[in-house]
Amino acid sequence: MVYKLVLIRHGESTWNKENKFTGWTDVDLSEKGVQEAHEAGKRLLKAGFTFDIAYTSVLKRAIRTLWILLEELNLYWIPVSRQWRLNERMYGSLQGLNKSETAAKYGEDQVLIWRRSYDIPPPALEESDERYPGNDPRYAKLDKSDLPKTECLKDTVERFLPLWNDTIAPTIKSGQKVLIAAHGNSIRALVKYLDNIADDKIVSMDIPTGIPLVYELDENLKPIKHYYLADESELNAAIQAVANQGKAK
């Protein structure tokens, strides 16, 4: 039995466009991001994909990306599960700061550590900060211990895995075709887990916006292969654009 799982990072957001650390800030798609999502849906349709259920975060840039995909696929009717555990990594007090300006101030190496290291989080938010999730009604029912003030990728992996193990993996094994529309770091968390990527190797992995990533999994949900629905030159350009975000100008 071969299962297919499709992952997609949301299309470009307004803060991606402005090169800002976004994290749990609920910004929308840019005009380019909307176009990326429509193109991704068309690619999935052309490649013959269909889905029984979709998972996304509780942040509008991922939700809107999913809506557009389902529109292109004529699958508005399938169940959609919005899960806070699929949220982007919480960037703490960096949220809202321009990445290039932060790199110029603290150095590219420090920003790379904050953005891409596995176990070093950025500076944390205070609970009194309006950016703290405890001040957002969408998280009102969560235990306070689940609300991050900052996260490294290790924290994001640990936050995501219960959702994978308890909900998404059993759904895939039941034979349902699953689509996940999420964020760069929540997808990196899953990719790291699926491919068993070493902590020091995941640092250099970039997930492009708006390009479907297909995993073919065996009966134990171990990867057989994975591929993007994009040609090599387009994919490389998209990945490089993400990699350049943390560099000083």
Curated annotation (Swiss-Prot):
Any GO MF annotation of the entry: phosphoglycerate mutase activity
Site description Transition state stabilizer, residues in chain: 183
Any one biological process term the GO annotation gives: glycolytic process
Keywords linked to the UniProt accession: Glycolysis, Hydrolase, Isomerase
Cellular component GO terms held in the UniProt record: cytosol; phagocytic vesicle
Reaction equation(s) it catalyzes: (2R)-2-phosphoglycerate = (2R)-3-phosphoglycerate; (2R)-3-phospho-glyceroyl phosphate = (2R)-2,3-bisphosphoglycerate + H(+)
Superkingdom, taxonomy of origin: Eukaryota
UniProt binding sites for substrate: 9-16, 22-23, 61, 88-91, 99, 115-116, 184-185
EC number per UniProt: 5.4.2.11, 5.4.2.4
Entry coiled-coil feature ranges: none
Active site: residue positions: 10 (tele-phosphohistidine intermediate), 88 (proton donor/acceptor)
Family: Belongs to the phosphoglycerate mutase family. BPG-dependent PGAM subfamily.
The protein's role, per its UniProt record: Catalyzes the interconversion of 2-phosphoglycerate and 3-phosphoglycerate.
PANTHER family hit by this protein: PHOSPHOGLYCERATE MUTASE (PTHR11931)
NCBIfam families xref list: pgm_1, PRK14115.1
Subunit structure: Homodimer.
Protein name as it appears in the record: Probable phosphoglycerate mutase
Organism of provenance: Dictyostelium discoideum
